[in-house]
Amino acid sequence: MTTVPRTTDLAAIRIWLTVVAGLIALMVLVGGATRLTESGLSIVEWKPVTGTLPPLSERAWTDAFEAYKTIPQYRQMNAGMTLHEFKTIFWWEWGHRLLGRVIGMVYLLPFLWFLWRGAVSGPLGRRLWLIFGLGALQGAVGWWMVASGLTERTEVAPVRLATHLSLALLIFAAIVWTLRRLAPRAEAEVPARLRLTAWGLVGVTFVQLYLGALVAGLRAGLVYNTWPDIDGGLIPKAANLWIQSPWWINLFENDLTVQFMHRMTAYTLFLLGAWHAFDVMRAGAGRTVVRGAHRLLAAILVQAGLGIATLLMVVPISLALLHQGTAIIVLTFAVLQAERLSPRRVAAVVVPQAAVAAGQAG
């Protein structure tokens, strides 16, 4: 017998997961602002419990500032910074970490409550445990990222930044998927190719998000600020794309190569989204599916326009954050469309309590 949440528990679970998803989206934006303001290395220690409180005295502020002075970023970029200026960057990083702790508590405490009530079990329970594990891993990945900028570099390693952001968005996507699975819907009778394309859109979106994080980590948006050409042409010279050795390093550390891949993946995402929007109409997939495809394509177009504007204007903070926020919307629409087209197993279907009672009586 499949165990399903009671009607009252189901409503509470959906509200809870919606709040967590919203907080994660906010966390991603605060993290983006922390990066854009060069604030991410202002706290040089990882104290998951005792680090909850900020400095509460002038002596504590001085100690925190002196600790910051020991890392390369201060010596090479911010030498001469005042304590007042340090406080500005400190608050961004502290707020980012505090929000992470808040998300952990907002997820964990209701989760334990639902477990105690027996409201989550089976596939739903396993999925929620997996999300919890990914959240715990994210905290460690965050410090792994910060640690990369404390010894030799003046910024965090771009690959670690991209890993940190990608994991946050993977958790967000898992919650969005779970929320959609908790909502009743009719099965979509569609050709298998539509499901394949929808999942392809999710995959390409994640690749694009990872590349966007690499662009941000490398500050690659501050160079090659022309469009549609890049480095003097629509396609850069191969010698410039593969200038570093070994060749694969260019995929992660060459400004030109990473920005070019980000552009090409954006074009791929648009073409795939446009094809999907056309194909669902041609297949007569139903109004809900067609609307989902059109919303996704519209979000991709808006995101592309914001990306081009951000590049041409040399990455103003407000526009860069808007670009990052719209990326979350694209991911949300892509995940929702993939779920909309995916068949549901019996264990994943939410059954009204009356139906459960009737089934047990029979």
UniProtKB/Swiss-Prot annotation:
Subunit architecture: Interacts with CtaB.
Pathways per UniProt: Porphyrin-containing compound metabolism; heme A biosynthesis; heme A from heme O: step 1/1
Cofactor: heme b
Reported function: Catalyzes the conversion of heme O to heme A by two successive hydroxylations of the methyl group at C8. The first hydroxylation forms heme I, the second hydroxylation results in an unstable dihydroxymethyl group, which spontaneously dehydrates, resulting in the formyl group of heme A.
Protein name (database record): Heme A synthase
Organism, as annotated: Bradyrhizobium sp. (strain BTAi1 / ATCC BAA-1182)
Membrane topology of this protein: Multi-pass membrane protein
Keywords: Cell membrane, Heme biosynthesis, Iron, Membrane, Metal-binding, Oxidoreductase, Transmembrane, Transmembrane helix
Catalytic reaction list: Fe(II)-heme o + 2 A + H2O = Fe(II)-heme a + 2 AH2
One BP annotation, GO: heme A biosynthetic process
Top-level taxonomic group: Bacteria
Subcellular location: Cell membrane
Similarity comment: Belongs to the COX15/CtaA family. Type 2 subfamily.
TM segment ranges: 10-30, 102-122, 128-148, 159-179, 198-218, 266-286, 297-317, 318-338
Designated gene of the protein: ctaA
The keyword Nucleus is assigned to this record: no
First-listed, main subcellular location of the protein, grouped into a coarse class: membrane
Enzyme Commission number(s): 1.17.99.9
Annotated residues for binding of heme: H262, H323
InterPro entries listed in its UniProt record: COX15/CtaA_fam (IPR003780), HemeA_Synthase_type2 (IPR023754)
Key word Cell cycle present: no
Entries under Pfam families matching the protein: COX15-CtaA
GO molecular function, one term: oxidoreductase activity, acting on NAD(P)H, heme protein as acceptor
One GO CC term, this protein: plasma membrane
